[in-house]
Amino acid sequence: MISRAQGCLLGQLAGDALGGLVEFQSPEEIRRSYPKGVRDLADGGTWNTIAGQPTDDSEMALLLARMLVKNGSYDPEAARKEYQYWLNSDPFDCGMTISAGLQGNPDSNSQANGAMMRVSPLGIFGARFALNQVAEWAMQDAALTHPNLICQQANALFTMGIAHSITSVCEANELYKSIRQWAVDLPVETKLLDIIDRAVNEPPADYIHQQGWVLIAFQNALYQLIHSTNFEEGVVNTIMHGGDTDTNAAICGALLGAVYGREAIPAQWLNSLQNCRPEAGHPHVQHPRPKCFWPVDVLELAEELCLTVSI
């Protein structure tokens, strides 16, 4: 259980940081720069970050994780306060839907991926709870910034998948079948069920022109879950499609990490995360951030999420 919890949070963080190296680029641009795939966490990239540094995706996820450990429970208002703190911390990137939602103007038409990109810690924490409770929490968290029903339902399925994988030690194909059945049972919107079905045979048709769409991220994660031979290939394959690479890879990495566990995470990725300290005054740090956004304690944090007693 601990290994899969750690794999999930490591996958979230590593996928985010790795994808951040080529965010917004086309597949052709990425292949020219990385003919063998984007495989090492390094300084630089779209946001000129240091190796392993989280983008907005995982900064929000880290705050959610720390809140869950501190409080021993999920509360949407407590989560809102954490996300508001993040917004006020002058992040170097922030999606429009998140910004509008946290400023009191949520966009009910947006189907952006900003809720799913941060929610994986809730799946880890929720592994000891009934899946219907996990789904309720995930929908509440999405509604803070992404009230569209597609976003809420996709959040529920994704988080349930993480929680179930951590507790049941199921294989990838079994997990997909469970997610498909939950989608029928809830039931979810037809558009969401359609991409779940299509993930059996194909990845999203276009990662570029609607980049940032939650259904691209979710279909990709499910496709990689079914078809990738291992954790690393699933994350790298995701990034090579281009577009919103950091978020797509963070979501895919969290789901696959919950299946494959800590042992599947490349050593270079783990070492980079555990030594990533974007501290003010360091000559290589272009975006210094408060310590709560550093991923150095990722293994301990994931374990605490598993062991925290609900109050």
Short names for language-model regions:
Residues 1-311:
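Structured, active/binding-site neighborhoods that engage oxygen-rich ligands
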